């Protein structure tokens, strides 16, 4: 993890979790993470695997140009990336495994032309963390999508669909100290022949 939002949210999640596989949704005190909420979201794990947003931070609403709450999380991503995102969400829930990733956003082309702004890419760090909900383990997921830097179009025009850059499960050493160690666990997404490969196994487990 590189972004302070990711690090702070993970540390808070870890304190709530204690010896459990994941903390409960009701354990979260918004006041304790008020400085993070603009970049945070909560996803419901539904039977249809649409993954509706149950909480969506104000900066994410600004990114997408409207209220994100209730919208399917997968709709925020390019068609080509949705299978990987869905598999990552299920891996987090089924394996109680935190996942960190990178994404990229551009201003929507038509809107950027009308508003006379650039389409310069804005880079994000994605963090996905498992939650329990009223004791159920396959119910909710806590996440953050935090931007690196600023671009002139942000908040003025909506972003196009997010582009997934990378996904990986957090290593044991990284979970202990946020040291950035990556060798203990294989990445979820690998670059081979110019593309990512993500294989989904029964029960939502995923391997590269």
What do these predicted regions represent?
Residues 2-165:
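Sensory/regulatory domains in signal-transduction proteins
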Residues 167-206:
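Short hydrophobic short-linear motifs embedded
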């Amino acid at each position: 993890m590189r972004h302070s939002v990711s690090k702070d949210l993970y540390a808070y999640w870890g304190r709530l979790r204690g010896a459990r596989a994941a903390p409960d949704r009701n354990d979260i005190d918004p006041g304790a993470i008020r400085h993070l909420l603009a970049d945070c979201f909560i996803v419901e794990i539904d039977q249809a695997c649409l993954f509706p947003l149950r909480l969506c931070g104000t900066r994410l609403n600004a990114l997408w140009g409207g209220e994100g709450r209730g919208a399917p999380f997968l709709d925020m991503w390019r068609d080509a990336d949705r299978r990987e995102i869905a598999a990552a969400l299920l891996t987090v829930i089924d394996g109680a495994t935190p996942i960190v990733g990178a994404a990229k956003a551009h201003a929507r082309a038509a809107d950027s032309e009308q508003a006379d702004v650039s389409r310069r890419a804005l880079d994000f760090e994605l963090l996905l963390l498992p939650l329990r909900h009223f004791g159920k383990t396959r119910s909710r997921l806590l996440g953050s999508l935090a931007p690196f830097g600023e671009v002139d179009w942000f908040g003025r025009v909506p972003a196009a669909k997010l582009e997934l850059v990378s996904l990986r499960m957090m290593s044991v050493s990284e979970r202990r100290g946020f040291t950035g160690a990556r060798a203990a666990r294989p990445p979820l997404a690998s670059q081979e022949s110019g593309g990512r490969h993500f294989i989904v196994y029964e029960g939502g487990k995923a391997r590269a």
